[in-house]
């Protein structure tokens, strides 16, 4: 077995958004443009030079406000790249056995519609950015933030003990400014996008834990230091996938008391006449999704997809059946997480039966 390089998707492509997107200043999987190749940023192999972050920010097709924020913070461009990468990895993992597998092909078409899959893209993109920013602060990669505000623990002391907490407070505050206020929009789709974005942020917040470490002679707990730590992003992805599975279809209604447009779920038999507003943790969508069985502007279809004969082939292959062949399969093994957003693996190989959907 030989070591494999860290997982990299689309040659470390960065998902970007158009410069003139003031009404929907999103980032990551919800960027409105096609993927743009983006070189490695300030890695150990190629350390960032002074002022290099300005060029990196200019390469990102951000809104004017976002570009200003990026240029003020030397560590932000790299963190944005990490967040896009993290969100894409998690999306593809959670939907690996689904007809829509978070393929980059068709992403632009999806973002123009109000499907459940679109809702997930907004949620996981916001969650990844929240997570990556909080981790970047605690890792000392950002100049304008540091560890979380743990009581009685200075940042320098925290780093000395190796207990620097993830700064979720700064992350969520920054993200609100970075994405811009959209809650007051009168457009139903914009309100749905904003709602799903906050579902993603909320999922990260719910995974914040208090971790403690003892200091003392021979392992005694004479002094105990506690700090805030985010749960692994895989757990956040699982929460959001569950929200996707139970997503609520909504329409719009005018709140007469407040005089504004709000999201409402359709009325159910025996329920309120006009339905109920979705809960803060519900993903919301407006249109029923296509089958994703055949190639379309939303996905490449499922022909040729590898499936599990005992579980996913029936649904994944859309009734077309599947082919069986024996081949040498190379797969990632002995994987180890490096910091927040990368996984280093070895490559293993073995002979096995592979099932692929017929065309």
Curated annotation (Swiss-Prot):
Task: Tell me, in a sentence or two, what this protein's role is.
Answer: Ligand for members of the frizzled family of seven transmembrane receptors. Functions in the canonical Wnt/beta-catenin signaling pathway. Required for normal embryonic kidney development, and for normal development of the urogenital tract, including uterus and part of the oviduct and the upper vagina in females, and epididymis and vas deferens in males. Activates a signaling cascade in the metanephric mesenchyme that induces tubulogenesis. Acts upstream of WNT4 in the signaling pathways that mediate development of kidney tubules and the Muellerian ducts.
The reply to whether Lipoprotein figures as a keyword in the UniProt entry is yes
Name the GO terms of the biological process aspect. Answer: animal organ morphogenesis; branching involved in ureteric bud morphogenesis; branching morphogenesis of an epithelial tube; canonical Wnt signaling pathway; cell-cell signaling; cellular response to starvation; collecting duct development; embryonic cranial skeleton morphogenesis
Species name: Mus musculus (Mouse)
What cystine pairs are annotated? Answer: 91-102, 137-145, 147-164, 212-226, 214-221, 293-318, 307-313, 317-357, 333-348, 335-345, 340-341
Q: Which GO terms describe its molecular function?
A: co-receptor binding; receptor ligand activity; signaling receptor binding
Q: Where is the secretion signal located?
A: 1-23
- Lipid conjugation (O-palmitoleoyl serine) is at 218
**Residue positions with a glycan:** 101
Write out the PTM section of this UniProt entry. Answer: Palmitoleoylation is required for efficient binding to frizzled receptors. Depalmitoleoylation leads to Wnt signaling pathway inhibition.
Alphabetically list the UniProt keywords. Answer: Developmental protein, Disulfide bond, Extracellular matrix, Glycoprotein, Lipoprotein, Secreted, Signal, Wnt signaling pathway
Q: Which disease is it linked to?
A: Spontaneous insertion of a retrotransposon in the Wnt9b promoter region causes reduced Wnt9b expression. Decreased Wnt9b expression is correlated with increased incidence of cleft lip and palate.
Q: Where does the source fall among the domains of life? A: Eukaryota
Location in the cell reads: Secreted, Extracellular space, Extracellular matrix; Secreted
Return the InterPro entries for the record. Wnt (IPR005817), Wnt_C (IPR043158), Wnt_CS (IPR018161)
Keyword check for Manganese, yes or no: no
Subunit description: Forms a soluble 1:1 complex with AFM; this prevents oligomerization and is required for prolonged biological activity. The complex with AFM may represent the physiological form in body fluids. Component of the Wnt-Fzd-LRP5-LRP6 signaling complex that contains a WNT protein, a FZD protein and LRP5 or LRP6. Interacts directly in the complex with LRP6. Interacts with PKD1 (via extracellular domain).
The UniProt similarity line reads: Belongs to the Wnt family.
Explain the consequences of disrupting this gene: Complete perinatal lethality. All pups die within the first 24 hours after birth. Mutant pups lack kidneys. In addition, females have normal ovaries, but no uterus. Males have testes, but lack the epididymis. The early stages of the development of the ureteric component of the metanephric kidney appear normal, but branching after the T-stage is disrupted, and mutants lack mesonephric tubules at 11.5 dpc. Mutant embryos have a cleft lip and palate phenotype at 18.5 dpc, plus additional, bilateral defects in upper jaw skeleton development.
Q: Output the Gene Ontology cellular-component terms.
A: extracellular region; Wnt-Frizzled-LRP5/6 complex
Spell out the protein name for this chain. Protein Wnt-9b
